[in-house]
Amino acid sequence: MGKLRFLFALWMAKLSIPALKITHHDGTDFPGSLACRLCPDFLRYVGKPPTIVAITGTNGKTTVSNTIADILEANGRKVLSNRAGSNMWSGIATTLLAGCTLSGKLREGYDTAVLEVDERSSSRIYPYVQPDVLVVTNLYRDSIKRNAHTDFISFILN
């Protein structure tokens, strides 16, 4: 049942991408959001590259993740990356969705994922997408309502 549900979610999410383009929407997180709503274990089943680099922190995630992806690509790696900064579970799912076939397996050639991950969303992502390298840019209390205290964010990341 789980695999059928995953495939249905995958196909619906992949179909949503051209629909979003036709209606002039970016779709940086909607396909992944749809996939995860239809199959809550979507991140578990979707194909992932053998090497995963995750970048998290309060500030600088997009710059650091794009720089790492650029360096890896310049050195011949084929990289999946959420360059637009869609860094919550739905954006991560959209990024992985872009790199997989209609059967959910990783497309040939991809060897690395460089994923910007929202520090507050990490507890929903890392159980399914386990990074080989975790880069933490910094932890600040720049938004008290959201992050409360740096120790709280550190607790989430651990």
How would you describe each model-predicted region?
Residues 3-158:
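Phosphate-binding loop of NTP-binding sites
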